[in-house]
Amino acid sequence: AVEVQSLVTNSVLPTPRRAVNGVDPSRIAMLVAVLYRHGGISLLQNDLYISTIAGGQAKEPGCDLAITAAMASAALNKPIAKNVCAIGEISLTGQVRPVPRLEYRLREAQRLGFTKAIVPATQKPLKMEGMTLAPATNLKDALAFLHLAKQRH
């Protein structure tokens, strides 16, 4: 399990700054675009700082949903509950895709105190004793579960 933190600030630079630690910078660029296109949250004019805690690495696609949730949370200034984790790869179309060893990841998250998890809707298990699993088909589903869905006017 890897904790991901994100800070979003208004940029005064012509090209906004992207500072990352423990995360693949090219993956962040892709996730920023997907968050804008499929989540309605634009970070294109913002400085973005993303870091993993305690030297952890979030460089595999199964961390996409957690990273994107952290960015959306920071952009909207709405914290994610401490007992919620997010596991899943995000495609360019905004779909939440299956990840290897989901059951192992969920057991580890549960051991660390998480009681709710957003998981790919197309992947088993969709039940786990002592943990509420929220199946997400796409990024909008995941953001809605986290109360981070962008309000349309």
Predicted regions and their residues:
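Peripheral, non-AAA+ core regions of ATP-driven protein-machinery
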Residues: 1-153
